[in-house]
Amino acid sequence: MSMHDPISDMLTRIRNAQRANKAAVAMPSSKLKCAIAKVLKEEGYIEDFAVSSDVKSILEIQLKYYAGRPVIEQIKRVSRPGLRIYKASSEIPSVMNGLGIAIVSTSKGVMTDRKARSQGVGGELLCIVA
């Protein structure tokens, strides 16, 4: 079976693993998935991530919990293959009045909404995390 939207698959695996109180989740790796995982780690939503360098590289994400509850309360895909969403730096929305983040793919790499606004770059709005 071919996968049409690997980013949605990644977000769904994270959401399902946290609902099942799993310590870690594994998935096929790509450069974009690693960049998203790096942003999630920098913002404190996951413990860590690692990429195995076998024949098919696997991305393993160590999930984070606080007081027995998942740190990620909501993780949602915004731009999808059937309907891409692009925003200028001034149009990038604030998630939960700054308590959550939007992950944006820009010409300067994958970054949070705050970083994109401060650097004055827009791009594709990949997902929101709260």
Swiss-Prot record:
GO terms for cellular component: ribonucleoprotein complex; ribosome. Keywords: Ribonucleoprotein, Ribosomal protein, RNA-binding, rRNA-binding. Pfam families: Ribosomal_S8. GO terms for molecular function: rRNA binding; structural constituent of ribosome. GO terms for biological process: translation. One of the primary rRNA binding proteins, it binds directly to 16S rRNA central domain where it helps coordinate assembly of the platform of the 30S subunit. Part of the 30S ribosomal subunit. Contacts proteins S5 and S12. Belongs to the universal ribosomal protein uS8 family. This is Small ribosomal subunit protein uS8. It comes from Neisseria gonorrhoeae (strain ATCC 700825 / FA 1090).
